[in-house]
Amino acid sequence: MNKTRYRLDVAYDGANFCGWAPQPGLRTVGGLILDALRLICSEPPDIVIAARTDAGVHALQQVCHVDLISSPDPVWLLHRLRSLLKSETDLHILSAVKAPVNFHARFSAIGRRYVYRVIDKRSSWYPQNRYFVYRVNAFLQDYRMRRAASGLIGLKDFGAFCKPRRMGSTVRHLRQFEVIRQPDGQIHFFLESDAFCHSMVRNLVGSLIEVGRGALTLQDLFCYTKIAKRTPKIPTLPPHALTLIGIDYPQEHLFECQNRKTRQKRT
């Protein structure tokens, strides 16, 4: 049977979700969307996501695609999904559009952008930040963290910052790693890469926190990076302060080429 592919852009507050992936008995982002789609369509669809997020991680723009036999009008589909999910106030379907068959939410993507929010002892702590900001009980040195971040940018083996895995490469192209202290004292870590390994963002920011507090030297950090093996010296920060900002894609005529390139790298 012929199917029509749809691209769904989604935003969510991850505080009360057990991640994205549908799991029996657990409240997940993908599970709620899948349940809504099952009420709309006769066939049980599969959802392909651009960037899988762990429990507690938020998203301003997550992207997924789904293939449907029923081929509903995308405007109707958007309104129907929003109606079915209206009681889920921490989840919102931003858009629903028909996509070409060679669009792939994961493999067509050329970039993922994240921000991790931290506050240190320089600034006052407000309880309402507890779901979105990581609190560090130390004075962090911004200039040291910026030097560390600039030294990590580029095409490298990020095995030191990735959850150990038997299969697949840990080579990634980190294009952006900025450390910006906001007027209210929060420190925002902005990262962009072609892709990120599991826990890679939280480990990268964790390494900078250790550098900023003086617990890790720049020399040691770059040595661990070169060795490309996980070390307890680089902590994994909690997920609640991490937000997926968005997913970037090439122009439509480049989808097929990008799909092939990504599959060769990641599978």
Curated annotation (Swiss-Prot):
Q: What is this protein called?
A: tRNA pseudouridine synthase A
Q: What does this protein do?
A: Formation of pseudouridine at positions 38, 39 and 40 in the anticodon stem and loop of transfer RNAs.
Q: Which InterPro entries match?
A: PsdUridine_synth_cat_dom_sf (IPR020103), PsdUridine_synth_TruA (IPR001406), PsdUridine_synth_TruA_a/b_dom (IPR020097), PsdUridine_synth_TruA_C (IPR020095), TruA/RsuA/RluB/E/F_N (IPR020094)
Subunit organization: Homodimer.
MF terms in GO: RNA binding; tRNA pseudouridine(38-40) synthase activity
Q: Which gene encodes it?
A: truA
PANTHER family named among the record's database cross-references: PSEUDOURIDYLATE SYNTHASE, TRNA PSEUDOURIDINE SYNTHASE-LIKE 1
**HAMAP family xrefs:** TruA (MF_00171)
Q: Where is the active site?
A: 54
Q: Which species is this record about?
A: Tropheryma whipplei (strain TW08/27)
Q: Tell me its family.
A: Belongs to the tRNA pseudouridine synthase TruA family.
Which catalytic reaction applies to this protein?
A: uridine(38/39/40) in tRNA = pseudouridine(38/39/40) in tRNA
EC number(s) from the headed UniProt entry: 5.4.99.12
EC top class, in one word? isomerase
Keyword terms = Isomerase, tRNA processing
Listed binding positions for substrate are 114
* GO annotation, biological process: tRNA pseudouridine synthesis
